[in-house]
Design a protein with these regions (language model features):
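Contiguous, often N-terminal, cationic amphipathic patches that form binding interfaces
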Residues: 1-50, 62-68, 72-93
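Beta-rich strand-turn-strand
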Residues: 54-59
Length: 93
């Protein structure tokens, strides 16, 4: 997993697949893949990712880069690396 701890929280690198049947997180080798229901129009996918990860992790989530790309970097505020890894692995099954 591409996760780095910073003084602000945890930076998470993900690959996004839009237009899925439901929102889900999958661990694919060393990569985290997030399947989103929304279409990649007018930031809908970005909003869905931030909203769903915030609910899942109970933390503030911000998009750092990848606003128009499938490769994204997210900041999860006030979180530890091990906590985020654990929750993501549980979700990824």
């Amino acid at each position: 997993m591409k996760i780095a701890e910073t003084e602000d929280g945890v930076v998470l690198e993900v690959f996004v697949r839009p237009r899925a049947k439901n929102f889900r997180i999958v661990a694919d080798g060393d990569e985290i893949v997030i399947f989103c229901e929304e279409e990649p129009i007018k930031g809908k996918v970005n909003k869905e990712i931030v909203r769903e990860l915030s609910k899942l992790l109970h933390r503030k989530v911000e998009l750092l880069s990848g606003f128009t790309s499938k490769q994204k970097r997210l900041l999860i505020r006030d979180a530890g690396k091990s906590e985020i890894e654990r929750v993501l692995l549980e979700q990824a099954g």
